[in-house]
Amino acid sequence: MQFSSVFPLEGKACVSPIRRGGEGSASDRLKIGDSSSIKHDRAVRRMCLGYRGTKNGAQCVLTSDAGPDTLHVRTSFRRNFADPNEVAAVILGGGTGTQLFPLTSTRATPAVPIGGCYRLIDIPMSNCFNSGINKIFIMTQFNSASLNRHIHRTYLGGGINFTDGSVEVLAATQMPGEAAGWFQGTADAVRKFIWVLEDYYKHKAIEHILILSGDQLYRMDYMELVQKHVDDNADITLSCAPVGESRASDYGLVKFDSSGRVIQFSEKPKGTDLEAMKVDTSFLNFAIDDPTKFPYIASMGVYVFKRDVLLNLLKSRYAELHDFGSEILPRALHEHNVQAYVFADYWEDIGTIRSFFDANMALCEQPPKFEFYDPKTPFFTSPRYLPPTKSDKCRIKDAIISHGCFLRECTIEHSIVGVRSRLNSACELKNTMMMGADLYETEDEISRLLSEGKVPIGVGENTKINNCIIDMNARVGRNVVITNSEGVQESDRPEEGYYIRSGIVVILKNATIKDGKVI
């Protein structure tokens, strides 16, 4: 997709022809546009990527085209470029994880596996590294053991070069005189460790704080967001995404004026309040096929603050408020320059079992809406040093197969098979997210378990599974049927090793489903 960028010519900047045709870099090729196209492109770029014009002075539209009418110009001014070394990222590790239960019964939300071999925490971490941001704080709270283990294995084991940066894990603690040790909200989580951040600022030239969530799937260059923040001289910048009618009430919704300044923020509105937050999203027609299907602009829970503004809000102005979205931001926009950055690429909030399942299944589509595969902006995860997957007479269609699996005469369709998974003969997996295993069982161990009437890790012979999430280290026996043929929407059967959420069967971590079981 080709974009046009608007650059202002300020002060003594001049337009002088340099050369024509295909010579020079894209940044040197400037094409004079008519006033209508400039106005359109200027508005789009201001709201999406932050390039701003001025009231006075010539306007030029940057394009990647090189044609006979293309005029190359050089200007005598420089933009104030954002420096990733002046940015510190804070990744919120989530609360109790009730929305993703039972996947969060023994782990924090950011530690939930996704895409076969990744964890949710890998998304913001990798986006930070790919954006050049290497000063990162991760705030953990409930069930954080596996999250801490993954962070240390992946990011603190020497595999990634931080140069002068660092990754610090900050676990919820209770200070003397405090009534509660747990984080009471997103803002309270940052406030609890404001002393750590302040101490860090004394030794590092940090000007901007990037607040991130640990339960979303997207690929973003955070420095484009920070650049708009700098260009607008904003106190706070919200990253926003267009959303449809069906899910709009799940998010904080925003309205902004023609300059990109946020003028209204409503947290999870319903009824007439929801209707009042509708906006004209036609300016996104360059990125979305039918913007009318997405009449709302939702806050992604990704924020950039000026350092001093954040400290003042948390320590003084709103010292008693606990949440950014529902409490602080709606008040702050009346007192501060709060800007919107519209992110029109793929973004999925992994807030429920249904959204988690759908996001994983979408990875199997051809072509997928989101790709983990990108050599320029890779996603990092724990190095496991596993051998390639071995398959024997299998039928596999539209599936993702992770490392170190053993597949024998099975059928896999529109499913994700996680690391170290074992599927035996005549078993069928369809529309299923199988997370895999933490360890291998040897052939001798498997034979012994079968001889004792027990179930090995993996999926047994002649088992049929559809519309299911199978958590780590689950043992599914032979001749099992998991299809939820009765269409049950909600059910709690922990004693039998499974739950049903939104019609999706969730097999628990370390659970055993005995031979012949029908779910």
Swiss-Prot record:
Signals that turn on the gene: Induced by sucrose, glucose and abscisic acid (ABA).
Biological process (GO), any one: starch biosynthetic process
Keyword Glycoprotein applies: no
Keyword rRNA-binding: no
Self-association and partners: Heterotetramer composed of two small and two large subunits.
Record InterPro entries: ADP-Glc_PPase, ADP_Glu_pyroP_CS, NTP_transferase_dom, Nucleotide-diphossugar_trans, Trimer_LpxA-like_sf
One Pfam family in the UniProt entry: LbH_GLGC
GO function terms (MF aspect): ATP binding; glucose-1-phosphate adenylyltransferase activity
Its EC number(s): 2.7.7.27
Regulation: Activated by 3'phosphoglycerate, inhibited by orthophosphate. Allosteric regulation.
PROSITE patterns found in the cross-reference section: ADP_GLC_PYROPHOSPH_1, ADP_GLC_PYROPHOSPH_2, ADP_GLC_PYROPHOSPH_3
Name of the featured protein: Glucose-1-phosphate adenylyltransferase large subunit 3, chloroplastic/amyloplastic
Swiss-Prot/TrEMBL catalytic activity: alpha-D-glucose 1-phosphate + ATP + H(+) = ADP-alpha-D-glucose + diphosphate
Subcellular location, record wording: Plastid, Chloroplast
Function field: Involved in synthesis of starch. Catalyzes the synthesis of ADP-glucose, a molecule that serves as an activated glycosyl donor for alpha-1,4-glucan synthesis. Essential for starch synthesis in leaf chloroplasts.
Tissue spec: Expressed in stems.
Pathway as given in its UniProt record: Glycan biosynthesis; starch biosynthesis
Domain of life: Eukaryota
Coiled coil region boundaries: none
Keyword tags: Allosteric enzyme, ATP-binding, Chloroplast, Nucleotide-binding, Nucleotidyltransferase, Plastid, Starch biosynthesis, Transferase, Transit peptide
Gene Ontology, cellular component aspect: chloroplast
Transit peptide: 1-74
Predominant location category: plastid
Record-stated family: Belongs to the bacterial/plant glucose-1-phosphate adenylyltransferase family.
Enzyme class name: transferase
